[in-house]
Amino acid sequence: MTGDDFAVALDKIRLRLGTQNFDLDCTFPQGQVTAVVGASGSGKSTLLNLVAGFEVPDFGRVVIHGQDMAASDPSERPVSSIFQDNNLFAHLDIFTNVALGVSPGLKLRAEDRQRIEVALARVGLAGFDKRLPGTLSGGERQRAALARALVRQKPVMLLDEPFAALDPGLRAGMTALLLDLHAETKNTVIIVTHHPDDIKKLAQRVVFLDRGRVVYAGSTADFFATQNVKAVDSFLNG
């Protein structure tokens, strides 16, 4: 493996959480969208947590842009995360929620404020600065979370089923927005999803997990043509 080939690598990772063992060895190409897929409990969120630094492997390395992350706290890693519940602070307006992505202490320069306004406009939330999260729809809250990730300007974005709570119309809108933003930023996106349509529309590659192990890692086209892998067949055909 060379740093030119991938943005993120889980290099011979071993981790035990409770009674479950995880053995993860896979890479995520620079500038591509990779879908992480598998049944409930297969290790999808654990994989993201390892990349983000919320879980520490018992053995092996997490490598991001050629750097071993062993000594890097989550706040020091070049990643932004978006979760299903969007993690917005209910008592803070949307501008302030997004501003936390720039400065946790809210020490903002004029250029920081401009960057926040640009991000809000880019996700379709211009004029929402003073609104509280509770006054927004589910799709609007996810757009605010995406704006917060954008202002962090990190090269790797982790998304843990960010559209799961949205209806089909909102899902389609968020999918289109994510594609547009990826075309602009060229960042590396790792998205956990259980929707085959999301995989087809968003991802160039797929990593499929089964009981804590990688059983497929390759192109999206080849994934949907995979045969004789029971876990993949169950996912694709119910």
UniProtKB/Swiss-Prot annotation:
Identify the EC number(s): 7.6.2.15
Q: How does it sit in the membrane?
A: Peripheral membrane protein
Highest taxon in the source lineage: Bacteria
Q: Which family does it belong to?
A: Belongs to the ABC transporter superfamily. Thiamine importer (TC 3.A.1.19.1) family.
SUPFAM superfamilies assigned = P-loop containing nucleoside triphosphate hydrolases
Q: Which Pfam families match?
A: ABC_tran
What name goes with this protein?
A: Thiamine import ATP-binding protein ThiQ
Name the reaction it catalyses: thiamine(out) + ATP + H2O = thiamine(in) + ADP + phosphate + H(+)
Q: Quote the cellular component terms of the Gene Ontology held in the record.
A: plasma membrane
The residues covered by the ABC transporter domain are 1-236
Q: Where in the cell is it found?
A: Cell inner membrane
Q: Name one GO molecular function term.
A: ABC-type thiamine transporter activity
